[in-house]
């Protein structure tokens, strides 16, 4: 692309240094930095291409299945298969202009795909385009199918692939980067805080381990939901009875779809092992599969829970890095771009703020998905495109933002160790370890004395004749307080 052509770049400079900008662009350094630092989900209201590609994959295995069942010839099947592969490899993206604001069953998009495949397959057979189609969009490409069962099948297929192949690896990447920092800072003692007030000592590594555990639980929850997403509506046709669909069509298609997705994964991600194997099966009850999308809603709930964990992570990083001179200033976040158009030298926690907004959007997507999933009327849910678009949007947001946050924020996280130690030395909550020795009431009196006269705990304990200095030092050891059971 022109933007990455090294022969057509100009060098511009801001307070953080030099950066390349495409020669033909009017924007400057800070815009270029933002483009590099926030490559998170660009979208519109057109039907997501993931749905189009999934429909093409389904049409491919449907053509093969219909050939095996003797319903179409090998000539038609081969042409449809070739056309399908061109579509899901992105060769005809401009042929799919429809928006999600269409019929609630996704019929228009299903027919859009049928028409494109019909025209291209006919062209492959006849050698030229013609208004007379050898391959019919309904009779051949859509054989044994209805929009009512095929569109929800494409929904589940696309969301399963996005989740297993992109969302989970990105979340695992963030977890792994956090783990590196967790081990690096495990023995750095700081003051914990509850209710935003000083509490007892802990280590920075322990604090980071909390984020790791929350995110790991989120990953496990998402993974547990994927087998249910792999139960497909295909074979239900119009209302769930399977009218006009051959017996065994759904089972054969699911087996073939499992094999196709496995081949595609190994082609796209040659050296990696999938986080979860996608094994597709016909839905046990096709009536429920057409009228309800409970599995997708539950997955959306898992994403929503993940967003709450990420929100805490981003907010805490932002708070702990506040300052640098007039805030907590325990964390030192990487300076990715200048922070203010009016205050020179200011650097803001931009990755934290970006992730925070992503989390809010994911929560909003979940609310919309919840409402849309409730719109099953009699035998059909009629908000399918909206459910698909919101979940795929969430998948893209999670994939991009977690990787960005890991690489642009967590990876280069540093500590202001002097400030952290200063807080430990000043904390009156170290008194907690004294309560087994002098009791709660005297410990409270000690804190009140130290606070009133602006003195340290040790000095105050000696003045009040509660403990001698040697005994105080023997008891009050922040490292041992942080690891009372030696579980470093």
From Swiss-Prot:
Biotech relevance: May be a potential drug target. Inhibiting the activity of this protein may be exploited to treat schistosomiasis.
EC main group: lyase
Keyword Cytoplasm: yes
Gene3D superfamilies from the UniProt entry: Fumarase/aspartase (C-terminal domain), Fumarase/aspartase (Central domain), Fumarase/aspartase (N-terminal domain)
Catalytic activity: (S)-malate = fumarate + H2O
Residues noted as binding (S)-malate in the record, renumbered to the chain: 105, 147-148, 194-195, 341, 346, 348
Site (Important for catalytic activity): 353
GO CC list: cytosol; mitochondrion
Keyword list, A-Z: Cytoplasm, Lyase
Subcellular location: Cytoplasm, Cytosol
Keyword Amino-acid biosynthesis among record annotations: no
SUPFAM superfamilies: L-aspartase-like (SSF48557)
Active-site residues annotated for this sequence: 195, 340
GO biological process: arginine metabolic process; fumarate metabolic process; malate metabolic process; protein homotetramerization; tricarboxylic acid cycle; urea cycle
pH dependence: Optimum pH is around 7-7.5 for fumarate and around pH 8 for L-malate.
Subunit structure comment from the entry: Homotetramer.
Cited PANTHER family: ASPARTATEAMMONIA/ARGININOSUCCINATE/ADENYLOSUCCINATE LYASE (PTHR11444), FUMARATE HYDRATASE, MITOCHONDRIAL (PTHR11444:SF1)
Function summary: Catalyzes the reversible stereospecific interconversion of fumarate to L-malate. Fumarate metabolism in the cytosol plays a role during urea cycle and arginine metabolism; fumarate being a by-product of the urea cycle and amino-acid catabolism.
Miscellaneous notes: There are 2 substrate-binding sites: the catalytic A site, and the non-catalytic B site that may play a role in the transfer of substrate or product between the active site and the solvent. Alternatively, the B site may bind allosteric effectors.
Family: Belongs to the class-II fumarase/aspartase family. Fumarase subfamily.
Protein name, UniProt field: Fumarate hydratase
Organism: Schistosoma mansoni
């Amino acid at each position: 692309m022109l933007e990455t052509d090294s022969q057509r770049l100009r060098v511009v400079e801001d307070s953080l240094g030099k950066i390349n900008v495409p020669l033909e662009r009017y924007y400057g350094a800070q815009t270029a930095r933002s483009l590099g630092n926030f490559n998170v989900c660009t979208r519109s209201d057109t039907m997501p291409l993931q749905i189009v590609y999934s429909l093409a994959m389904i049409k491919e295995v449907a053509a093969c299945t219909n050939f095996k069942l003797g319903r179409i010839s090998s000539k038609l099947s081969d042409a449809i298969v070739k056309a399908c592969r061109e579509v899901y490899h992105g060769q005809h993206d401009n042929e799919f202009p429809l928006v999600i604001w269409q019929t609630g069953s996704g019929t228009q998009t299903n027919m859009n795909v049928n028409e494109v495949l019909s025209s291209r397959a006919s062209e492959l057979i006849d050698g030229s385009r013609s208004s007379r189609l050898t391959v019919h969009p309904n009779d051949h490409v859509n054989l044994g199918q209805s929009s009512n069962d095929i569109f929800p099948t494409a929904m589940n297929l696309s969301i399963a692939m996005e989740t297993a192949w992109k969302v989970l690896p990105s979340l695992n990447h963030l977890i792994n980067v956090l783990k590196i920092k967790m081990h690096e800072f495990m023995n750095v003692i700081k003051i914990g805080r509850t209710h935003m007030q000083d509490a007892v000592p802990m280590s920075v590594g322990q604090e980071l381990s909390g984020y790791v555990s929350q995110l790991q639980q989120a990953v496990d929850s998402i993974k547990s939901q994927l087998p249910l997403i792999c139960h497909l509506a295909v074979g239900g046709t119009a209302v769930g009875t399977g009218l006009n669909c051959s017996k065994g069509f759904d089972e054969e298609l699911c087996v073939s779809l499992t094999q196709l997705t496995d081949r595609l994964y190994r082609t796209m991600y040659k050296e990696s092992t999938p986080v979860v194997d996608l094994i597709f099966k016909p839905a046990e009850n096709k009536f429920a599969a057409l009228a309800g999308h409970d599995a997708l809603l539950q997955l959306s709930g898992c994403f929503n829970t993940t967003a709450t964990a990420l929100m805490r992570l981003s907010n805490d990083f932002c708070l702990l890095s506040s300052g640098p001179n007039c805030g907590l200033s325990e964390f030192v976040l990487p300076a990715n771009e200048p922070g203010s158009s009016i205050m020179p030298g200011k650097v803001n926690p931009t990755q934290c703020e970006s992730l925070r907004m992503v989390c809010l959007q994911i929560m909003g997507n979940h609310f919309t998905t919840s409402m849309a999933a409730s719109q099953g009327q009699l035998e059909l849910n009629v908000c399918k495109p909206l459910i698909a678009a919101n979940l795929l949007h969430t998948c893209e947001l999670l994939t991009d933002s977690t990787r960005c946050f890991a690489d642009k924020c967590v990876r280069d996280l540093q500590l202001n160790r002097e400030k952290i130690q200063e807080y430990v030395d000043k904390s009156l909550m170290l008194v907690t370890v004294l309560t087994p020795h002098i009791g709660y009431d005297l410990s409270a009196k000690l804190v009140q004395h130290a606070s009133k006269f602006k003195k340290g705990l040790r000095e105050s304990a000696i003045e009040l004749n509660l403990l001698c200095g040697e005994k105080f030092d023997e008891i009050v050891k922040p490292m041992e307080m942080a690891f009372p059971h030696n579980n470093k």
